């Protein structure tokens, strides 16, 4: 609540601070890549705590800035950018089209969005109905953006047969799953819950 109060009471100052944080995150990610990281992921685990308008004001521009700065800095050193993943927990339901345009190669899905909904949004972007970042994806790929995640981490506490069924369901079109369409990293929809 304190952070949101700050955002609402000091929006300009918040944006300045968020840009500084994005700048430092980008520098840190570039250092990781220069040290050998072959893929990077940017997490915004609190994105769903913001309304759609607030997400587009106080989160999305800075997620985009990180991706752009990382690529620009690497290009200035003649280093190819590795794949970049963005994970904005809870924001996909209202902002997936904007997240697709944010400059990342992979969109991390939480367990609250059906994979086929996300895949349809990626397909719409690929087909030119949505302006998409020129840096995302690779030439010649079936889909310019891959998807990752979606399995509810709490399922790991279930019996093995339940876990197996949930993983199978991730791939079935009839249950909203990926349906064998496009690039997918099978993964959890968030971190492993302690306990």
Label every PLM stretch briefly.
Residues 1-195:
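Active-site loop segments of alpha/beta catalytic cores
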């Amino acid at each position: 609540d304190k952070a949101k109060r700050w955002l609402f009471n000091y929006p300009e100052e918040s944006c300045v601070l968020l840009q500084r944080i994005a700048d430092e995150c980008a520098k840190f990610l570039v250092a990781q890549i220069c040290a050998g990281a072959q893929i990077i992921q940017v997490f915004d685990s609190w994105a769903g705590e913001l309304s759609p308008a607030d997400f587009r004001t106080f989160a999305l521009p800075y997620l985009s800035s990180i991706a752009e700065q990382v690529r620009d800095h690497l290009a200035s050193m003649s280093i190819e950018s590795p794949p970049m993943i963005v994970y904005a927990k809870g924001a996909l339901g209202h902002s997936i089209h904007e997240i697709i345009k944010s400059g990342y190669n992979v969109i991390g899905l939480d367990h609250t969005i059906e994979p086929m909904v996300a895949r349809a949004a990626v397909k719409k972007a690929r087909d030119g109905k949505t302006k998409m970042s020129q840096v995302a994806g690779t030439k010649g790929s079936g889909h310019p953006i891959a998807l990752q995640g979606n399995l509810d981490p709490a399922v790991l506490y279930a019996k093995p047969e339940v876990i197996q069924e949930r993983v199978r369901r991730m791939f079935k079109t009839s249950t909203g799953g990926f349906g064998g369409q496009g690039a997918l990293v099978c993964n959890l929809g968030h971190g492993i819950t302690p306990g």
